[in-house]
Amino acid sequence: MTVIGNHEVVGMEGAPRLSEASARDYFELLKPRVMSLVVFTAFAGLVLAPGHINPFIGFTAILCIAIGAGASGALNMWYDADIDAVMSRTAKRPIPAGKILPQEALAFGLTLSAFSVIILGLAVHWLAAGLLAFTIFFYVAIYTMWLKRSTPQNIVIGGAAGAFPPMIGWACVTGGVSVESIVLFLIIFLWTPAHFWALALFKMGDYGAVGVPMMPNVCGEATTKRQIVIYAVLTAVSGVCPTLLGFASLGYGAFATVMGLGFVWYSLGVLRMPEGDKRMVPAKKLFAFSIAYLFAIFSALLVDYAIARIWLGGIV
């Protein structure tokens, strides 16, 4: 497969300059939907970490992590502008739509990256800042520039970038990394392949058109479906680990088990999906459920933590 070259969108005729692009256009560069998940899981890591952090410092930490995530999104859109212009799912993004020039997106992303890392280091903790810097580098250089266009395992390895936020939030409070923060990392890391391969199944045409070697395009639907089930099972097991390791209650464990079984159930629906199915309804259902699953798991961890704090505080 031939991957489209980045040069095909540079120097767009009639594209607006910095002063003509709206604030909304630049906000779209930050990938706000992805950022919301990053912010939520980082917040969970910060709250669940043992110790105390000043509320203002905590707010600053989450803001810096959000800006860093947005910077990664902007740099990803800068590099992927060529394939975004071809794929129906991404054709309306600011750069291929002609609202922002590629070089402006690059400058915007680099500026936000430096700002988020430096402020997080100065105001909160340099280990957390280092993890944020590594996350930005990993997502942009390792995943976007290398893995995404070179291997069907791009999501498996590249998924690490999306799994770091709770670990960064944890480090903001404790100044370190622990088994608990690694478990939070693993939940997202193992969740990522099933989530994105479900999307890749019903967007095979888009990925095939631009030569991105996603699992369904390179290895076929059958292999992808089996891999989805494997990662769904691994995700379900990792979701229960907080209880197994003693930092979440049996109530959380029961909830995580039910959600995990739901994840596996939807993945089995994908496995049973006929080869060449054009509608891909089971894949779309799994994709939607996977998003709900991750938000539900981290929400349950926060609720479980709040209940434990109330109980230990003698309020009930």
UniProtKB/Swiss-Prot annotation:
GO BP annotations listed: heme O biosynthetic process
Keyword Transmembrane included in the entry's annotation: yes
Membrane topology type: Multi-pass membrane protein
One CC-aspect GO term: plasma membrane
Subcellular location(s) of the protein: Cell inner membrane
Superkingdom classification of source: Bacteria
Functional note: Converts heme B (protoheme IX) to heme O by substitution of the vinyl group on carbon 2 of heme B porphyrin ring with a hydroxyethyl farnesyl side group.
Protein name according to UniProt: Protoheme IX farnesyltransferase
Classification lineage: Bacteria, Pseudomonadati, Pseudomonadota, Alphaproteobacteria, Hyphomicrobiales
